[in-house]
Design a protein with these regions (language model features):
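Residue-level recognition of short, solvent-exposed, well-ordered loop/turn junctions
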Residues: 40, 183, 294, 464, ...
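Signature of long, low-cysteine stretches enriched in small and polar/charged residues
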Residues: 336-386
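A Zn2+-metalloprotease active-site environment signal
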Residues: 19-287, 292, 305-307, 311-316, ...
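Short solvent-exposed coil/turn linkers within tandem alpha-helical repeat scaffolds
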Residues: 396-400, 450, 463-466
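Surface-exposed amphipathic alpha-helical segments
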Residues: 120, 245, 301, 390-428
């Protein structure tokens, strides 16, 4: 009882001593970080985001994002805050902001905007999350939750297992805002977009595109609606707010800029880049590094820039594939042991489909008491200057079947020589001029787009297949269409 009372007093003291004024509302609210700490958190988290997803190399598009972002930041409620804008090389349709002024757009979401005003509306929405300190507020709530778990863990041993709440970096990406925060960011998005001369009603039209795409995440990044739940009256509210702000700014013109935006994204990569790896018929191919290996049935593969993970559905079988550090087997083995607090049980040299390899059985130095033991196997494969590493981990009653599945994957690692797969290129957005009046479906047929992709392309263009389009209108199609 004394410990519980102490916890209540401690939390109350924190609540009383850490209130800060919200820059947007002017109200005081619980905030466990100062603005300087907020900026520091964003700066420390940014490298993790960049390392995980990569940055799109497109200087012209980046310059456009910087220009529009800085212009909008100046009319925001935190105009003195240094903002940073980046384009992530991810096909997932998302935009998000970290505390401290770090705003990210994926190439996936840029491909789905159909005019500059849609982009500006979402830009204002994300800047709104920063100016209203939504991310910092969510992070503060997590810190309070972590405090509660840490103190509670001295009472309950079982609770201790769940006390490892991740702090910065990728954890921030998966924070889910509430509908109240989303409504406020919609309001701020309309305000900021209107003040910079954009027709903010276009933002509502883009949210309809997001609805058609759905809110599910793809792999390691959530989609927009997964972390930005839609307020129930979003479309009507954005329209009403747009009218209010346009009346407040009678001397301002409000632009859409459709054609100029579409020309900016011409040749933008679309979808997954096959050169960085793709799965086809339960085989993972990596053309850039010229290898492939089979994927166990019903296991989930996630391909990130730094590693590939293959996970069994129960979560008790995990295969990690990446580039090892070290110039030889022993150096790579030592780095693996040191980095993961593991010990060597035994090792042996072997060959895998012509490659020199080493296999080692490992164990944890200090396994968690009361948990099922792990079986850990390391496989190192030498390929010229590259040292590939498989780390196979299994736990529970199904260790034998998990290990068998992972062994089949490792034993199937082979040199990729198929020219068609080696030369597979990323699909790209192509901006074309409509040749004749007709339905959008007819336009897609004119440009020989596969019928199986018509619905996808309608969403990409913010249209219905039955919509009428006029000759010379600009639309998006896809080049380098992957084989069906």
């Amino acid at each position: 009882m004394k410990l519980i009372y102490f916890f209540q007093v401690l939390v109350l003291a924190l609540l009383l001593s850490t209130c800060a004024k919200n820059p947007v509302t002017g109200k005081r609210e619980v905030m466990l970080m100062s603005e300087a700490e907020e900026i520091k958190l964003g700066a420390e988290s940014d490298p993790e985001i960049v390392a995980e997803f990569g940055v799109l190399e497109n200087q012209e598009l980046q310059a456009f994002i910087n220009e529009k972002g800085n212009e909008m930041a100046k009319v925001s409620h935190r105009s003195a805050l240094p903002f940073h804008f980046k384009i992530l090389d991810s096909p997932v349709v998302n935009a998000f902001a970290l505390p401290g002024g770090y705003v990210y757009f994926t190439r996936g979401i840029l491909a789905h905007f159909n005019n500059e005003a849609q982009f500006a509306g979402v830009l204002g929405h994300e800047i709104g999350h920063v100016t209203a300190r939504h991310g910092a507020n969510q992070y503060s709530k997590q810190m309070l939750a972590q405090l509660g778990l840490a103190i509670g863990s001295s009472i309950s041993k079982e609770l201790e297992t769940f006390a490892n709440i991740a702090g910065a970096g990728l954890q921030l990406l998966f924070m889910k805002f509430g509908r109240e925060d989303e409504s406020q960011s919609d309001e701020l998005g309309v305000e900021y977009a209107s003040k910079t001369g954009n027709d903010s009603k276009q933002m509502a039209d883009f949210f309809k595109t997001l609805d058609k795409l759905g809110g599910g995440g793809e792999g390691r990044m959530p989609a927009f609606l997964s972390t930005h739940p839609a307020p129930l009256d979003r479309f009507e509210k954005v329209g009403e707010l747009t009218k209010v702000w346009q009346e407040k700014l009678p001397n301002q013109s409000f632009s859409v800029n459709r054609d100029s935006y579409l020309r900016r994204i011409d040749d933008l990569p679309y979808g997954e880049d096959p050169q960085q790896g793709f799965v086809e018929k339960s085989v993972f191919y990596h053309p850039a590094l010229a290898f492939y290996f089979p994927v166990p049935k019903d296991w989930t593969l996630t391909n990130a820039p730094t590693q590939v993970t293959v996970t069994e559905k129960s979560g008790k079988g995990l295969l990690i594939f990446d580039l090892a550090k070290g110039n030889d087997f022993q150096a790579a083995l030592k780095e693996t042991l040191d980095a993961n607090e593991l010990e060597l049980v035994k090792d042996k040299n072997r060959r895998i489909n012509g490659f020199q390899a080493m296999e080692a059985e490992l164990k944890q130095k200090a396994p968690n008491s009361g948990t099922e033991p792990l079986t850990i196997k390391l496989i190192l494969i030498q390929d010229g200057k590259n040292m590939f590493r498989f780390l196979a981990i299994a736990q529970g009653n199904e260790v034998k079947s998990f290990n068998s599945a992972m062994d089949n994957t490792v034993d199937g690692f082979s040199r990729l020589t198929d020219r068609e797969k080696l030369n597979r290129q990323v699909e790209r957005i192509q901006i074309v001029s409509v040749r004749r009046n007709g339905t959008f479906a007819e336009v897609l047929s004119d440009f020989k787009m596969p019928i199986s992709r018509h619905k996808e392309l309608a969403i990409l263009n913010g249209m219905e297949l039955t919509d009428r389009v006029s000759g010379n209108m600009l639309v998006k199609v896809i080049k380098n269409v992957k084989p069906e």
